[in-house]
Amino acid sequence: MQRLLGSIVILATVFTFCEATISSACLRCICNVESGCRPIGCHYDVYSYSCGYFQIKENYWEDCGKPGTSFKACANDYTCASNCVRAYMKRYIGSSGCPANCESYARIHNGGPRGCRHPSTLRYWEKVHQQGCNVNS
């Protein structure tokens, strides 16, 4: 019985860790960096278009599960775009090798699935941090 309870505690801990999600505060800081948190449309940026509140690229939208009616429509709708970012983070934080915190989420948003491990995303994190977020936001 004690062994069974120990297994349940371990499974609950693993489940909780895997279910970590990006906070609304962290989302807002990323949104502020990307667009001033406005639906600014699409701009050509690094070989493809980046659109909307979070300047989402089409492959990012595909990775988050293609919510909404289209890539551009979702990116320019705050609720849809936020849900896309949440789904993207949920998909990749566990395999990134980084802790589930605002810094990791921001760096993954900027640098892709393992962006939290790339030194090139530290500058982006500083911009997010300047919006009032910290690692634990």
Swiss-Prot record:
GO cellular component: extracellular region
Signal peptide (residue range): 1-20
GO annotation terms (biological process): defense response to bacterium; killing of cells of another organism
Pfam families: Destabilase
Catalytic activity: Hydrolysis of (1->4)-beta-linkages between N-acetylmuramic acid and N-acetyl-D-glucosamine residues in a peptidoglycan and between N-acetyl-D-glucosamine residues in chitodextrins
Domain of life: Eukaryota
Subcellular localization, as worded in the UniProt entry: Secreted
Active site: E34, D45
Summary of the tissues where the protein is detected: Expressed in the basophil cells of the oyster digestive gland.
Disulfide bonds: C26-C102, C31-C37, C42-C51, C64-C84, C74-C80, C98-C116
The EC number(s) this enzyme carries: 3.2.1.17
Domain I-type lysozyme: 21-135
GO MF, one example: lysozyme activity
InterPro entries: Invert_lysozyme, Lysozyme-like_dom_sf
Binding site for substrate: K57, E58, N59, Y60, W61, E62, D63, Y88, H109, N110, G111
Enzyme class: hydrolase
UniProt keywords, alphabetically: Antibiotic, Antimicrobial, Bacteriolytic enzyme, Disulfide bond, Glycosidase, Hydrolase, Secreted, Signal
Major subcellular site: secreted
Family, per entry: Belongs to the glycosyl hydrolase 22 family. Type-I lysozyme subfamily.
Biological role: Has bacteriolytic activity. May play a role in digestion and in the host defense mechanisms against invading microbes.
Name of the protein described by the UniProt record: Lysozyme
Organism, scientific name: Magallana gigas
Gene encoding the protein: lysoz
